C-alpha cells in the first residue's frame, strides 16, 4: 500500500539536510544512511548514497529514473547464490 498523498513523501530529515548542504557547497561525497524507507528526491540526483543492506553499506548512484522510489529498492538484502546444479542424487531419483 502506498503512502497517503496528504501526508507527502517520507525522507529522513538529517539526510535531506546533508544533501542540501552538499548541493549548496558543490560537494560530491558518499553519504552513509540506514534509512532505506526514505524517498528519492530530485535534489539527490548526481549524488552517491551508501544504503545499509543489513551487513554493509552499498553505494547507490542516484539518477533521474530513481526519483519517487525508496532507497531500499536499489539494494538487495539477501544474497542470491543461484540454484543447485543437477547432482547424481537428483538424477538417480528419476
Swiss-Prot record:
Protein S19 forms a complex with S13 that binds strongly to the 16S ribosomal RNA. The keyword rRNA-binding applies. The keyword Amino-acid biosynthesis does not apply. This is Small ribosomal subunit protein uS19. It comes from Clostridium botulinum (strain Hall / ATCC 3502 / NCTC 13319 / Type A). Belongs to the universal ribosomal protein uS19 family. Signal peptide: none annotated. HAMAP family: Ribosomal_uS19 (MF_00531). Keywords: Ribonucleoprotein, Ribosomal protein, RNA-binding, rRNA-binding. GO terms for molecular function: rRNA binding; structural constituent of ribosome. Disulfide bonds: none annotated. InterPro entries: Ribosomal_uS19, Ribosomal_uS19_bac-type, Ribosomal_uS19_CS, Ribosomal_uS19_SF. One of its GO terms (cellular component) is cytoplasm. GO terms for biological process: ribosomal small subunit assembly; translation.
Amino acid at each position: 500500500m502506498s503512502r497517503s498523498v496528504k501526508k507527502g513523501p517520507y525522507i529522513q530529515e538529517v539526510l535531506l539536510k546533508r544533501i542540501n548542504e552538499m548541493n549548496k557547497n558543490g560537494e560530491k561525497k558518499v553519504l552513509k544512511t540506514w534509512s532505506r524507507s526514505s524517498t528519492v528526491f530530485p535534489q539527490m540526483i548526481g549524488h552517491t548514497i551508501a544504503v545499509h543492506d543489513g551487513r554493509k553499506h552499498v553505494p547507490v548512484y542516484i539518477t533521474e529514473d530513481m526519483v519517487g522510489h525508496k532507497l531500499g529498492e536499489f539494494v538487495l538484502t539477501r544474497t542470491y547464490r543461484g540454484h543447485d546444479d543437477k547432482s547424481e542424487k537428483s538424477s538417480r531419483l528419476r
